[in-house]
Design a protein with these regions (language model features):
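Conserved PLP-enzyme active-site core in the AAT-like
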Residues: 2-324, 330-345, 353-363
């Protein structure tokens, strides 16, 4: 017998709700119900020809109040990369912000699947840039920068809603960017990994910040909002989705048992649970922000408009919190930390984390 002893896990830490990512959260009960219901229904056609996938696609059309094309993929990187590839040729370019997920966190996926379309980073400057947003002027500056054939021709504008800094484009801000895009014959892609949080924050109809505002394709996130896996790629301009199913298959994103990706969406779309979950996550972020605002020496970095809170902490405080088992990301150099709340984040978890930060700051 080995004399090696496996350490007993600290269950308090192991089961603690964390603030690193909304991906840490599990599946909400309603999504789980439909997952298991689909499983209990027995055999069903494969590769998306099942009634579950058709039913959810119709429900999404009802949600957006338009006849859109809907596809399901496993994750957000695939959704963004394949959607952009459908809008671009290899000699085209995509205009985005310096902090866009497609620029910083998708391992070159958009470029790979488009056979080389270049990402053009546009710095809006001022408050917009500080809040992770594009502006109409920033888009036009990039379009007019060069027009010769030695430069990748701008073809798409990509907006992230909510942004990577936890801010939200207003309806008018979206319209301003899309109007400029249309002026220069550009298509508009929306990375909506946290689209639900943006809609809940704005308290608007989902169509008002998508197709009615000039967005051509939306990558609608579900994984961060209570689903087990899967994002929906929604083409409001259906002509742009021609042959998209081939792209999905080629990229290894066509689930043979598609119903297990699509069916859980029913739990989200019925009774607007997708907005309730997102609204709760947003509210928990506001609660955390309110706690942190009272801590001497702690700086809050950007407005909290969705489910993220950004704060500046001394490195000694960061290290102490991490040693205590708290998990969060350092996204900004010099102690800028991101704290994410999820659909299941409890008030008790928020209060405990805030208390830990306050204690660490007091001793710093």
């Amino acid at each position: 017998m080995s004399d090696h002893t496996t350490p007993t896990p600290d269950l308090a830490t192991a089961t603690r709700q964390q603030f690193a990512s909304d991906n840490y959260a599990g599946m909400c009960p309603e999504a789980a119900h439909w997952f298991h219901t689909a499983n209990a229904s027995g055999h069903a056609p494969a590769y998306g020809d099942d009634d579950w996938t058709k039913r959810v696609s119709d429900r999404l059309r009802e949600t957006f109040e338009t006849d859109c094309d809907v596809y399901f993929v496993f994750n957000g990187t695939a959704a963004n990369s394949l959607a952009l590839a459908s809008l671009c040729q290899s000699y085209h370019s995509v205009i985005c912000t310096p902090v866009a997920h497609i620029e910083t966190d998708e391992c070159g996926g958009p470029e790979f699947f488009s056979n080389g379309s270049k990402l053009l980073v546009a710095d809006a400057g001022g408050e917009a840039a500080a809040h992770g947003k594009l502006t109409a002027q920033a888009v036009e500056t990039m379009v007019l920068k060069r027009s010769d054939l030695h430069y990748p021709k701008p073809k798409v504008v990509s907006l992230t809603q909510a942004t990577e800094l936890g801010t939200v484009y207003s309806v008018d801000e979206v319209k301003a960017v899309t109007a400029m895009a249309q002026t220069h014959q550009l298509k508009v892609h929306m990375d909506g990994a946290r689209f639900a949080n943006a809609v809940a924050s704005l308290d608007c109809h989902p169509a008002d910040i998508t197709w009615r505002a000039g967005v051509d394709v939306l990558c609608f996130g579900g994984t961060k909002n209570g689903l087990p896996v899967g994002e929906a790629v929604v083409f409001f301009d259906r002509a742009l989705s021609e042959d998209f199913s081939y792209r999905v298959k080629q990229a290894g994103q066509l689930a043979s048992k598609m119903r297990f990706i699509s069916a859980p969406w029913l739990g989200m779309l019925e009774s607007n649970l997708w907005l309730q979950n997102a609204g709760h996550a947003n509210a928990m972020a506001q609660r955390l922000r309110a706690h942190l605002a009272k801590i001497p020496g702690l700086s809050l970095l950007v407005p909290t408009q969705a489910n993220a809170v950004f704060a500046q902490l001394p490195q000694t405080v960061i290290s102490r919190l991490q040693a205590q088992g708290w998990r969060f990301y350092e996204f900004i150099a010099g102690g800028g930390c991101r704290f994410m709340c999820a659909w299941d984040t409890t008030e008790a978890s928020v209060d405990a984390f805030a208390a830990a930060i306050a204690s660490a700051m007091k001793d710093a």
